[in-house]
Amino acid sequence: MIMVELEKRMDRPLPEDFVEEYRRRQAIELSRSVTCIPGAVELLKVVSRRKASICVASNAPRAKIDLNLQATDLEEFFQPSQIFSAYDVGKWKPDPTLFLHAAEQLGVAPKNCVVIEDSLAGIDAGIAAGMQTIGYAPTASQQPTDKVQFVHHLADLIPVLG
C-alpha cells in the first residue's frame, strides 16, 4: 500500500529491489542508533535466575526484532522459540492474539503472564489477553489507571518480578 502511494507521488515505478534495499539500509542505521533501555540487562538476569518463561512479542518483523536484540546485546536471554512477531500470527497489537499465541507456545496460562509494554497498543493487547500488564514509560507522563500500573525505570520491576 505504501509502495503504491510512493509510486503515485514519484510518478514512476519503484525499483524491484526497493523493499529489500530499504530494509538493508534501515538495518544498518538501526544497528548504529538503537540502545539498550537502562535496567533491561539487570531485569532479564533476575528473571532468568528465577527460571521464569520469558519472551519478546513484538509487532515488528522477526528480522527487526533479531537485529534489535543483537544491537542491544540482549539476544543471549532469548532462544528463537522465545521470540514472537505479529507477522507470525497475522494480527497486530492491540489485538491480543500475539500475546495469547506466545503464552500458548510457552505453556503458560494468560492469567499467569506479565506483560511489560511501552506502547498503548501493547498495553491494550495485554489487558485484552487477560494478562497482568505493566506499562513502561521512561518519562513520568503516564500515570497508573485501574487497569495498568506504569513504571518509569525497569529496575522498579526487579522487586515485583524477582
Question: What annotation goes with each model-predicted range?
Answer:
Residues K51-S53, K111-N112:
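Short coil/turn segments at beta-strand junctions that form active-site/ligand-binding loops
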Residues S58:
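Conserved phosphate-coupling serine/threonine residues in phosphotransfer and NTP-handling enzymes
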Residues P15-V19, C55, T97-L98, A129:
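Short, flexible segments with low predicted structural confidence
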Residues K45, P61-G162:
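Asp-based, Mg2+/Mn2+-dependent phosphohydrolase catalytic module
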Residues M1-A52, D66:
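N-terminal helical cap/lid subdomain that shapes the substrate entry/recognition surface
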